[in-house]
Amino acid sequence: MRKLLIASLLLAVCMVAMAQVTMTIDAKKRGPQIGQYHNGLFFEEINHAGDGGLYAELVSNRSFEDGLSNWSAYNGAVIAQTTKNLLNGAQTNALGVDISGASSSNKKGVANSGYWGMNIQKDSTYTLSLWIKGSSTFNGKITAELRSQDGNQTLGTAVLSGTVNTVKWNKLTATIKATASDKKGQLLLLTGINGHLDIDVVSLFPYTWKNRRNGLRPDLAQLLADTRPAFLRFPGGCYVEGEGSYDNAFQWKKTIGPIE
């Protein structure tokens, strides 16, 4: 009891002593000058700060490094990850798609849900590209559709330009103008032709900050630019050393050039 009383008295004394502390501020007196390089930005690829965040790419897992994550078969198509006859040495996986029972009125294919859905805005234009190779039985076109989250509404559609080659990988492209909006939309790649397809590096971009190719989200990038940073630390944090191993650490030299 005596020890408890002493402890209580000491605590009370400390609180009184803290309460007596005062601070005086002279608003007319200028303090130390802050250097022009004191404030800047720090970027670490964590919690989707880049992919799904500042980076404007709408397709999640576009090169299938994460297996079939965010990809699904549509209308009875059969999909599987493949590591054979890849696009190039930089790629480690591709998506194999087997289609049977398809027709012009019964198209089949694959869907990508993006990062928590794709924010599709009416009257906005989206740039689509992908690499593809087909079997000898495939001879047709690929149609891209932007769909609502529930799949019941088409938000935009386009036929990809280019040829599906049976010997080598070819790049197909399309521009899609949205006719309706859905903050959690999805991308569908469809065909009415039966056969086998290998697909890789599927990319869908909205308008980017300063209209730069393969660029940044305009809203987020402009907010950062408006802070007028003196510098950008990139990469920052543990991202620079990789996840568990230096083998997957960020290597900026490998980011130069086409995304594929």
Each model region followed by its residue ranges:
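Bacterial Sec-dependent N-terminal signal peptides
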Residues: M1-V21
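Extracellular and organelle-lumenal recognition/adhesion modules and their flexible linkers in secreted
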Residues: Q20-E260
